[in-house]
Amino acid sequence: MAFWNLGTLKLEQFRPGIMSKAQIGGNLIMVCMQIDQGKEDTGHEHPFDQCGIVLEGNIEMFVDQERRILNANECYFIPAGQRHGWKTF
C-alpha cells in the first residue's frame, strides 16, 4: 500500500493495549500505532530503518544510549540494527 489515510486506516491489535498497522519495505518500516498509557517495550532491533511522528500525547523513547521524551509533532529516526524501545505515560 503506497498511501495511508490516518482517518480511515484500519489498525489491528499488536499486543494488549497496542493497535498498529505496519508496512515493511526492503530497508524501511512505516508503522502507525495507538498505544495505551502505561505500556512499555524494553527494547528490540530489526534489520531496517524506522522513522515516525508522534501525533498526540507523549512517549519516552531510547535509541541505543540516547533517551528522550517526545511530544506531539516531534519525529524520530532509528537506524537499522539499533536497539530501541519506548514507554508511554
Locate the predicted segments by residue.
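Short, surface-exposed secondary-structure edge patches
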Residues: 42, 51, 66-68
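Ligand-binding loop in jelly-roll beta-barrel domains
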Residues: 80-89
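Short, conserved beta-strand element in jelly-roll/cupin
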Residues: 34-36, 46-61
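Structural motif
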Residues: 58-60, 67, 83
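A short, N-terminal "cap"/entry segment at the start of jelly-roll beta-barrel domains
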Residues: 1-27
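Short acidic-glycine-tyrosine-enriched beta hairpin
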Residues: 66-80
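Conserved short histidine dyad/triad with adjacent acidic residue
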Residues: 16, 31-46
